């Protein structure tokens, strides 16, 4: 089984929907340890992506991801814009020319995307950032890709690993970004970036389950 271009476009539409639905939650999470703009910034970015999709719907998946990355860089403020922009730009570079993605393709694209975020943000696991959701998700996906199991359970396991990573940020003391200025006071709060990352990966699992029903 593979993820088609249509699946990819639907995933991006679902990303926009889930970010809009959780806009206020992301704002509240960011208000506790940041500057309260993550929800609004992410919503603005993915609404821009949504408007862009009709123009790029006939492109290959790599070109679609690159266009998404550019849209996010130009419309999402704060640290999230460059980081999520890099995420999609790196995924786009690895999927150039493809009109469908196998599980190994998706795993490799996610790995390139996460590595791009690491290089751009210079964060490490446990720093209380989006990486604390993305890295467990990537490891889960790689295990499924190596074992040759199905795409649907792989995406669901990846989303669940991201959820657990997101929750694991609650007791952490932030070592990156505005939250790090709070020191010990940043503990006890869920990281908004890890939360938005989980939402995007959950949307991927939900999209595939809907398309394969």
State where each predicted segment sits:
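N-terminal loops that bind phosphate or other acidic moieties
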Residues: 1-213
């Amino acid at each position: 089984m593979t993820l088609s271009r249509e699946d990819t476009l639907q995933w991006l539409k679902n990303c926009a929907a889930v970010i809009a639905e959780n806009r206020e939650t992301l704002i509240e999470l960011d208000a506790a340890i940041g500057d309260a703009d993550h929800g609004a910034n992410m919503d603005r970015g993915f609404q821009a992506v949504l408007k862009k999709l009709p123009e790029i719907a006939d492109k290959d998946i790599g070109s679609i991801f690159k266009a998404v990355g550019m849209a996010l860089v130009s419309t999402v403020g704060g640290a999230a814009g460059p980081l999520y922009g890099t995420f999609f730009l790196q995924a786009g570079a690895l999927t150039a020319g493809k009109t469908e993605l196998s599980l190994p393709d998706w795993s490799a694209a996610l790995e390139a995307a996460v590595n791009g975020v690491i290089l751009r943000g210079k964060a490490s696991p446990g720093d209380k950032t989006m990486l604390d959701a993305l890295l467990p998700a990537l490891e889960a996906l790689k295990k499924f890709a190596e074992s040759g199991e199905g795409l649907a359970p792989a995406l669901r396991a990846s989303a669940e690993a991201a959820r657990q990573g997101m929750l694991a940020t609650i007791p952490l003391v932030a070592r990156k970004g505005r939250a790090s200025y709070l020191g010990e006071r940043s503990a006890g709060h869920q990281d908004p970036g890890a939360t938005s990352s989980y939402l995007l990966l959950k949307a991927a699992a939900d999209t595939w389950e809907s398309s394969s029903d």
